[in-house]
Amino acid sequence: MITHAMEGSKTFNIPTFVLDENCNFIPDVLSRANAKFIKEVLIRDSYNAVCLANSFIPMATQTVEQILIIITKFKFSRSRDLLMSVFRLGVHINRFYAGKNQVKHMITMMKSLFDTEEAMRQLDRALMGLFVDARDNSYMPLIALSLHENGLPDSKFIKAVRLIQTTVNSFHNRPDADIEQYAEKLRAYNYLYKIPKYSLKEAVDIYSDNLKDLTIGVNKKPTLLFTSSDDAYLSHIYNDLLFLTSTWNMIYNCKKEIRRLNTWIKYEINSIMETAVLVGFQLPDLKETILDLAALISNMNLVSPDKELFPHYKLILAKLFEICIFATKANICILPSFIKGHLIEFEDVLKRSNDDEDLNYLLLKSRDSDDEYDEDKPPIQVDPGRVDNVLTDSDFFNVTPENAFSSIAIMPISYDKTIDVEDNEIQVLEVEMQSLSAVVYGAVASKYGLSLEQVIRKLNRNEGRTSSRASPSHSTSTVPYSPPQSDRSTPTSILRQRVPMRSNSRSSSVSFSQEDSNRSHYSDETNISDYSYPMADLELEDEEPMEDHPHSPQSTSSNNSMSRQSRALQNGQRRRAPTMVPSSQTRRQNNARPRRVARRLTEMMNDARL
């Protein structure tokens, strides 16, 4: 057993009943069938470690992680990445649920010690007998008023113990032999308990039983020395007061660990959501199950902090085990991080590519061909930027238009972009959140037949905001949309679905930036592409002052129909003009041609709209 190596140097035994057939899972947390699945997946030593970490013994979260060693059997190693995260989450949820009930029971039992008027008078007499000096007497109410669940954090506990130890001069205090080693038995059922310097082995035995009953949930009032007999000695009061302060400090630390664990659980769940979506790329049959999971996580994220979260945790955990069982039966190796890496690379290719380029070629191209092998030639170094075509190969992922996850836009994205949702087709999307990477909103939108734009606007409306529309272009001048931020985080970002833009002809085209931020492409049979110079790239040799320019921003509103490209046409015309200063008549002729071109372009735009 795991604990044999620890028993040699101890005077007590770690409880042997921390292992059970249900892996110490409470039936309200995990079903017996799912607990049996854990036992089937893990090797024996790992199963024992999970049972110990999953036991009722209160311990720090970092101690749980040291004990929790998850090792799957070889036949389940293909799904190891998914199984490890789900099993760890299950242990944390079980400890969270058990810990809350445990702390509630401890508080009830400890408060029952002095729930009557007679018991309170007995405590007052004991304290007055211990703190006999006038100087020490002022400490008595400071300690008595701190005996509750929120009264003794570590800092106050240390001060209280020091104050109690100052009373040893009021009686003959001679500790029993080897009392410190003997007192280690108090940690057998509670790893959060801090052991003060007791003086009586008799007291340690009683307090050990008290801690055991408090930990495992026995409905029995704790026993104290000065209340269990008519003859109350000062040494009894001294040890009892140390027990009271140390136990209330332990309860405070238990509550603190439960709060920490709750925060970690919420983060784990949202992180596993991303893993589940990546698994869905490899197992498209899980699409509906993952959408159900996304809806559950979305509901959890919207719960107020003062509400109970365990019902949400229970449903989410059951759905995750459903995914795990399906994944272990599939004849495929589950590699979420591998898939995410290729998705990021695929998106980077989309970001750099032009609309008329073949994505398959971009994903597979390299500077040299390594398809043919020649033993006389040295090995060819493949381009480091090359990636295998794992995303567009339908045989690898069995991705079809009917089951592709990209069609509902619930994957994370690696670049900051701006939001624009047009005709239910997502071109560019960004959602800024605080800490979690849940990808639930797009999934919920798809599940309930809503467009993602409707979901975003609904979220804005709930927070009293208006939705922000931005250009689908990659310009950095667009304003990003920031959804409502709260203590419950939501997706960092969501995958954009690149919508190819179609040109009206095969000839050269010019892109026009309209005031409504929609992009259109128009072609001209004439050599219009000669005039399409970006304005920022021009080096004008004969630039007129801005205030005198007929198309400057300070001109009248009648000139606002001129787009930036039309102004670039005029600048390009001047660039090809001689460097010598032309006459006024020549200048008017040169200025007339760009205006004619601009009018023609405006007419073409109006015709295209009609």
Swiss-Prot record:
PTM note says: Phosphorylated.
InterPro entries, A to Z: Herpes_pp85
Q: Where is the composition biased (Basic and acidic residues)?
A: 600-610
Phosphoprotein recorded as keyword:
yes
- The species this protein belongs to is Human herpesvirus 6B (strain Z29)
Give its localization.
Answer: Virion tegument; Host cytoplasm
Q: Which family does it belong to?
A: Belongs to the herpesviridae pp85 family.
An annotated GO cellular component: viral tegument
Q: What is this protein called?
A: Phosphoprotein 85
This protein's UniProt keywords: Host cytoplasm, Phosphoprotein, Virion, Virion tegument
Q: Where is this region: Disordered?
A: 462-530, 543-610
Which residues lie in Low complexity bias regions?
467-478, 503-515, 552-567
Q: Where is the composition biased (Polar residues)?
A: 484-495, 581-592
